[in-house]
Amino acid sequence: MKPSEIREMSIEEIDEKIRQLRLELAKERGMLTMGTSTENPMVIRNLRRDIARLLTIKKEKLREKR
């Protein structure tokens, strides 16, 4: 997910996307602990990075509102 795409979203949409990605991350981590290999081992890293991007841009937007 590109930062330019995230900046176009509203804060509510960002919150919803964060929730979705956190659920997906929990599912992937659960599969990993169960011993099931994932199709793509980079999925967990990419999910974590996307969540960090979303949180960073959300904070930027909240600072702008002040």
Swiss-Prot record:
Question: Which InterPro entries does its entry note?
Answer: Ribosomal_uL29 (IPR001854), Ribosomal_uL29_CS (IPR018254), Ribosomal_uL29_sf (IPR036049)
The record's Gene Ontology biological-process terms are: translation
- Single annotated GO MF: structural constituent of ribosome
A matching Pfam family: Ribosomal_L29
Q: What is this protein called?
A: Large ribosomal subunit protein uL29
Answer whether the UniProt record assigns the keyword NAD to this protein.
Answer: no
Can you tell me which family this protein belongs to?
A: Belongs to the universal ribosomal protein uL29 family.
NCBIfam families for this protein: L29
Q: Which UniProt keywords apply?
A: Ribonucleoprotein, Ribosomal protein
Give the CC-aspect GO terms.
ribonucleoprotein complex; ribosome
Is DNA repair set as a keyword in this record? no
Recorded source organism is: Thermococcus gammatolerans (strain DSM 15229 / JCM 11827 / EJ3)
Transmembrane spans: none
What domain of life does the native source organism fall in?
Answer: Archaea
